[in-house]
């Protein structure tokens, strides 16, 4: 993938459905906020910034309302996006050789980030065909070295939002595992797509049911501005004080040691502005429905997402590598599921423009209509930078 896609990336003639990148101009409100916050109000405006108290207090209040949990400002660590939040979480919870459970298909950066933290990924599969959490598989994967289970909701790449019953059962099995092995198994709830939900779909954070939860969040998704790095790592306010305090005590030093994982001054000043902004959910819904209908008609199996801006679909019968190349031959690029260890599927990002999606649709039909492929070039499975 990386060679063919890399050669064409940015070419106006292609239909780029790979990553969650913008294909239209940024939100006007974002531009205005950054312009206004760039104007210094005092001499320390651009001095070193950690987690600013004003930002922490604002976010604690917003999270109290959004997640119905009594967050305090000290529970919020501002980070340079969810990447940094996740890496900090790995380092404050895991020691060298500790294990973390991942449910696949999964975001392809979890595994290398765990390895970089000297931790050991333990992989289980989501349940087919709806890609729900396989709680039995998760429980079986937890062993004496397991310190962390990672859950991503809404889920990339499938768009699934896990329901309350599933999350309650997950909390119960984590309690059992913690008792069984005599140490706490933490939960990382990765929630960067939390506000990107369709048709009024509700959302419950796993932190509602399991006190030993850390929440990672990024503004890059709701703003469709992944190049402006800001997010946070939130510690559940339900976590017992002793453990909460222990994590808080190492948070600053870990963020510093990992390369100053604090957002820049302008982004922190802009937090109240960012909270009121969103990309056009109605447009995303329209693109989702258009793609899902067209692909289903063309013979693909499509999982309609509850959230995110991705469509997860199964290739028709045949060689997935061949199908991917046939789309690329028609100037359409998607993310192969092999990057997420699920070869028979692929992911479409519908952050693409309406015109780009409209141009891409005939190619999907052509791939299923003609079983003979003119292209047998292999897919290279090194992901480009992106999500």
Segment roles from a protein language model:
Residues 14-16, 216, 301-307, 338-339:
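Short beta-strand
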Residues 211-285, 368:
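Conserved core segment of the aminotransferase class I/II
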